Structures are given as C-alpha cells and as structure tokens.
C-alpha cells in the first residue's frame, strides 16, 4: 500500500513524473498519481531484485544485468555505461570518530560531508544543548568549506569561524536497523532530487538518480554511538531534511548523551533513531525506536 509520505511526494511531482511512460505506469496508472492506501505494483523492480538475489550482486556490475541496465538508461537519455558500473563498486572507509564521555561516535567519513556537518553541530551542542542556531550555522559552514576547498575532517573541524552557507539542497532519506545483540546499521541515501530524474530505466523498475554535476549533492547524515570498553551499542541515528540533515543527527546525538530521549529536531530536519540508554546487548527495555511524525515514517521494535 502507498504510504502517506509517498502519496505526498507523488502529488508534489506529478507533472514531471508522469511525463515518463515507465514512471507513469508505476506511480500514476491511468494517468492519476497513486494516493494514500493505493496499491503500488513494481513487477519490473521485483524481477531485477530477484535476479540479483539468485545470480549475485556481481551481475549488476559486470554481468547481464549490468548490460541490461546500461541499455535501459541509454533509452531514457542517461549516460550510464557498463564501464561506469564496473568502476562504481562500494568501498569501505574509516569513519570519522569522536569521543563523547565514555562513548564513541562514528560519523560518515568524507567525501560524505554530512558527517563533518553533523560532527561540527554536535561539537557546539555538546557545550550548549540549546544553541541550535549556532550548531546549524557551524554544520553548514564546515560542509560549505569542504565543498569549496576540500581538506581532511580534522582540519575542517578545527578551523572554526563562519563561512557562507550552502545553497538549497535536494532530498534525501534515512533508515536505521538494530538487532538484539547490538548489531547496527545507519544508512542515509539519495537520488539527488525527489524521485531523481523522474525517469525509470525501462524493464528494470529502477528510478534513475539525478546527476550531482547538475544539482548540489545533499548532506548525507548518519551516526552510530557505542562503548568500546563494554563492547556495547548505544544509538543509531539517520538524518535528512536538506540543509538541516547534519543538525538533525547532532540534535539526536546530544539528547542520546544527556537525557537518553528523543525530541523533534529543528525544521526542516528529520531524524530516525534507535537509542538504548543502558546499551545493547543487555538492557533491551531501555531502547527507544523513534521516527519523526512530521516525516510520516515508521518505527517498530521488540525485545525478543
């Protein structure tokens, strides 16, 4: 069923999205955008995911699925080639780590500048939890500085001062998942625009992302808090909300390290979080599963 959040987004981009036949067939069958509670069918995407599941993810990068995707994007006016897919493999990178009392915080590493943006905002809030405006300014300033001149996280965070803010940034979203043993994932992702280019690669069900060369990339914000001494998890946060994504993450982090709760983050930021004040594994009853009601998201959890 179509969620309220998806229905609102579909209504806001109905014109551009229905201009693409493949996208219109999915999101606006009969020429009318799907509404809340409507039935969303994505058979082509289901086939693509089934192929990845049965053949392996390598098929996306170097196999038949990669060739199919390259041909489909060409038909939609996209520039993706098989060579692009082959060279675009995911990679591991050391996190940006900061101490918070007895805990450690892992922020996203550069070039995902939402990590330094969140770290800068948290640095302000750690000294004054009420200084939201100053934290937001610090968040945007450090990200703008990185985009203008590059540099490493330590240098960027130590420079301080003010800098011009960021232009209006595109949409992103986030999710967090935690198991009862404290294994955690915090993920922030984007199509560089709401519904990306608004085009679906024919036969694949895959929405094509907008090029970061055309639009400024969003701030991708996520963080995980753990205690190394007791080998335990404390919190996982995902932030979104265009320019306020970094502040959203930092605001929840500050609450996790003080009250252990989660109040709404400053607009237009949104956050999804799992906070276990007494850590995992060990005290599952201390965990809160929270999503911002303004984002029409979903949060659920149990101790079994």
Please provide the spans of the model-predicted regions.
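Amphipathic alpha-helical
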Residues: 61-87, 148-163, 181, 189, ...
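Generic structural motif
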Residues: 105, 159, 241-242
């Amino acid at each position: 069923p179509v969620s309220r959040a998806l229905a609102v987004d579909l209504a806001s981009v109905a014109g551009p999205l229905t201009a693409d036949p493949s996208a219109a067939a999915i999101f606006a069958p009969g020429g009318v955008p799907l509404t809340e509670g409507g039935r969303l069918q994505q058979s082509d995407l289901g086939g693509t995911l089934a192929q990845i599941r049965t053949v392996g993810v390598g098929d996306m990068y170097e196999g038949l699925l990669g060739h199919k995707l390259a041909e489909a994007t060409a038909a939609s006016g996209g520039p993706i080639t098989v060579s692009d897919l082959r060279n675009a493999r995911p990679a591991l990178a050391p996190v940006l780590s900061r101490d918070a009392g007895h805990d450690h915080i892992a922020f996203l590493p550069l070039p995902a500048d939402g990590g330094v943006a969140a770290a800068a905002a948290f640095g302000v809030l750690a000294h004054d939890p009420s200084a939201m405006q100053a934290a937001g300014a610090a968040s945007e300033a450090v990200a703008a500085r990185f985009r203008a001149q590059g540099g490493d996280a330590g240098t960027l965070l130590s420079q301080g001062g003010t800098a011009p803010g960021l232009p209006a940034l595109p949409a992103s979203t986030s999710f967090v998942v935690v198991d009862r043993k404290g294994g955690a994932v915090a993920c922030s992702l984007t199509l560089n625009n709401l519904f990306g280019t608004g085009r679906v690669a024919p036969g694949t069900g895959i929405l094509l992302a907008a090029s970061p060369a055309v639009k400024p990339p969003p701030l991708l914000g996520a963080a995980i808090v753990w205690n190394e001494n007791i080998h335990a998890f404390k919190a996982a946060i995902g932030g979104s909300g265009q320019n306020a994504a970094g502040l959203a993450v930092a605001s929840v982090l500050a609450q996790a390290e003080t009250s252990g709760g989660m109040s709404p983050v400053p607009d237009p930021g949104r956050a999804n979080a799992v906070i276990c004040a007494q850590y995992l594994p060990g005290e599952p009853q201390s965990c809160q599963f929270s999503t911002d009601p303004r984002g029409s998201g979903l949060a659920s959890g149990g101790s079994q």
